[in-house]
């Protein structure tokens, strides 16, 4: 009897943890959309497509997923210098937006789950706080 109860306990624990992480991600994405609208949309556009050669796309962006830490650092501290996104070179400047670590996590979760992007590996405030210049 004990093995069955133990098995059921672990099974339902994993389901509960999975559901709460999914709910946390959904809430983060909703908050991130508002932050994106306030701080990012003027350059990267409502569609996340950016402006070719000027403002890199966030929609279906290979850079976001291949360079997660650099993407977070760019939002947190600003970005300058050449980057390559979807095979196209960009060499502009993005000023830091003055966002808190939790706001950066939220906007990253929104960006990496919008416009054809899909990321179940949630960006957290703790992860952002560990990113240094």
Predicted regions span which residues?
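A contiguous binding-surface segment within folded domains or other stable secondary-structure elements
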Residues: 26-29, 42-81
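The canonical Cys-X-X-Cys-His
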Residues: 32, 36-46, 107, 111
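Bacterial Sec-dependent N-terminal signal peptides
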Residues: 1-31
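Conserved Rossmann-like nucleotide-binding pocket used by diverse enzymes
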Residues: 15, 36, 95
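Electrostatic cytochrome c docking/interface patches
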Residues: 19-35, 50, 54, 130
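Axial heme c-ligation environment in periplasmic c-type cytochrome domains
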Residues: 52-59, 80-132
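Alpha-helix boundary/capping residues
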Residues: 11-13, 39, 78, 111-114
């Amino acid at each position: 009897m004990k093995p069955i109860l133990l098995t059921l306990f672990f099974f339902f624990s994993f389901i509960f943890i999975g559901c709460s992480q999914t709910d946390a991600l959904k809430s983060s994405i909703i908050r991130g959309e508002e932050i994106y609208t306030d701080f990012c949309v003027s350059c990267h556009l409502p569609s996340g497509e950016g402006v070719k050669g000027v403002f890199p796309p966030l929609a279906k962006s290979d850079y976001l997923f291949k360079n997660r830490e650099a993407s977070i650092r760019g939002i947190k501290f600003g970005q300058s210098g050449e980057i390559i996104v979807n095979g196209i070179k960009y060499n502009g400047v993005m000023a830091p937006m003055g966002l808190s670590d939790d706001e950066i996590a939220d906007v990253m979760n929104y960006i990496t789950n919008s416009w054809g992007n899909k990321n179940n590996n949630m960006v957290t405030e703790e992860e952002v706080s560990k990113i240094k210049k």
